[in-house]
Amino acid sequence: LHKAIRRQRQMCIRDSRQPLYRYLGGIDLEMPQTFHNVINGGEHADNGIDIQEFMITPIAKTSFRDGFEKIVNVYHTLKKVLEDMGYETGLGDEGGFAPNMKNSEEALKALHESIIKAGYKPGEDIGIACDCAASYFYNKEDGKYHLEGKVLTDDELAAYYDKLLDEFPELMSMEDPYDENDVEGMVKFTATHKDRIQIVLDDFICTNPALLKKAIKEGAGNASLIKLNQIGTVTETLETIRMSRKNGYNTMISHRSGETGDTFIADLAVAINGGQLKTGAPARSERVEKYNRLLEIEEELGKGERLAFFPDDVDHD
């Protein structure tokens, strides 16, 4: 797919003589809501945190640049907070920190403190999201979730998530809160939480229109994670985006681990109008290049560019 993307970009430049985001999206464009992975756990880290990613997202912003600057401030403040707590601050593959914490509550407390120390209000200026990647701690033999020293049923896992949501109301989005094969758990959680948080489907749908159609019919999730090189073609990727929007699902364009410096997803996130973008922390060159591209696009669009706002202003057209 990366080769197809490069060919498409070359054709766009040669034939249309316009930026890729305009070629893909026309004139109805919107700068994306970005989600930045800043603390790693699960398979991405060797620590006591079973939830895989903790992200921050700019809620209050006057421009894309303004929101990104807020994220950078919180990121650097988090580094200092972790150092003061006695944790090492080496960077993982996606630019996030992997402190040797005991559990997810510690990670959320560190983020909460960092947002405040950076001069912002949790839940008003900066929100938190997480990729639970529940398949990592789901035990197929007993059908339960082995999470940070606890063995939990579907309902007990929901109660655990409720505890986090009550303690940290700035937690606004959860990706893959249940195992990809635990349809009953995911559907039940969606029914009780869809009006409270964004529930993002990744492993559950794999950017596959057929799997998304099944999830919609079952009532699972309210947002789709879109990975460009997961389904195999740009056409199928765009079909998954269209189906999501048609059925009221938010869309989050995502990087992959082992990401390259290719910036196509930045153009696509703008082109699909009102999408969200998950592409790592504001660190490491392959991540920063995508944010630099978004800043370039904002400059090209000029003053008055439209901004996607989360969670209250998502365009499903």
Regions found by a protein language model. Give the residues of each.
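Glycine-rich, aromatic-flanked loop segments that form ligand/cofactor-binding clefts
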Residues: 21, 25-40, 121-134
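Acidic, glycine-rich active-site loops and adjacent beta-strand->loop/helix elements
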Residues: 24-30, 39, 60, 205, ...
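Mobile "lid/hinge" segments at catalytic clefts and subdomain interfaces of large enzymes
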Residues: 29-92
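Active-site-proximal beta-alpha loop/turn segments in soluble metabolic enzymes
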Residues: 53-64, 88-104, 133-148
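Catalytic core of soluble alpha/beta enzymes
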Residues: 84, 105-317
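Histidine-centered active-site/metal-ligand motif
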Residues: 2, 44, 255
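Single conserved hydrophobic/aromatic residue that forms the stacking wall/gate
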Residues: 1-13
